[in-house]
């Protein structure tokens, strides 16, 4: 078998989640969800701050996928000329729940150490009625739509075993700015990405974090001024961004976070390290679709999360990125370079032979 990396959302129901887990465990092969939003600059630096205790104990988190897809509905794959909706609009019409949760949930789950000392235990989901979605179907089919399942806006509340709360939102219908929220509320500080990036810390924590106020009235009633925020980010810049950040900006790919994600995947595989996101992350982040549907179809009842780790969620203490020792990293890099050179040499020979024919 081969190690596998799957584009988000990777699994759309519990059965698919368990199939991936069982296969990964049986074959002893990695199965990583390609959640690029875990590698954006604000999320990575904020994760490092959270892990260093800057916000105290993080007790609440928010994430979202709010993205008006009106310019894109006509560009999704269609199953022949008779398909007026395209696969994505059709899927939203037939399925309730947060069907694209991982962009919002992934980064906050890492900050809360999910299945590394805590686990998501119960959720309650609510949605609005479908107004925009229903109108989209009617406009494309020229007929009444009496059953658009996915509400225009879905909100899922999750409580963890350790008493933390996560709020995840999904809205691809209404006209509003792109928003993944990404908000952490801690006992000593606060972080927020959308719509305005900022940090707020209590006075003692500000001093403890080594950021000295330059104004007299600096307090947690407002975000840190720009200079203090830049100093905080500089102090807690994530090691992965130090290594890949500038190169990622040059290469691009969703601002560079795709490059960082791919680089970390390759790095971990080359060095024999645990991946940044495992098959249990995949299942936990993707299962909101079916669990939320179960909740809303039963009068927004609480629904229990399966323990995809089969009781092992509290064995590893704290989410961490894995790193090789410098000498091991250098050896793996040289080995990879030699292998790549060999492939290029072989490819050039085969290409030359093909041109002669």
Regions found by a protein language model. Name each.
Residues 20, 46, 291:
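Aromatic/hydrophobic pocket-lining residues that form π-stacking "cages" and hydrophobic walls in ligand
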Residues 69-71, 174-177:
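Short glycine/serine/proline-enriched coil/turn segments at secondary-structure junctions
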Residues 1-39, 53:
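Beta-strand-loop-alpha-helix segment that lines the small-molecule cofactor/substrate pocket
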Residues 156-162, 186:
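Active-site beta-strand termini and strand-to-loop segments that position acidic
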Residues 109, 177-185, 192-195, 201-357:
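C-terminal helical cap and adjacent loop that interface with cofactors, partners, or active-site loops
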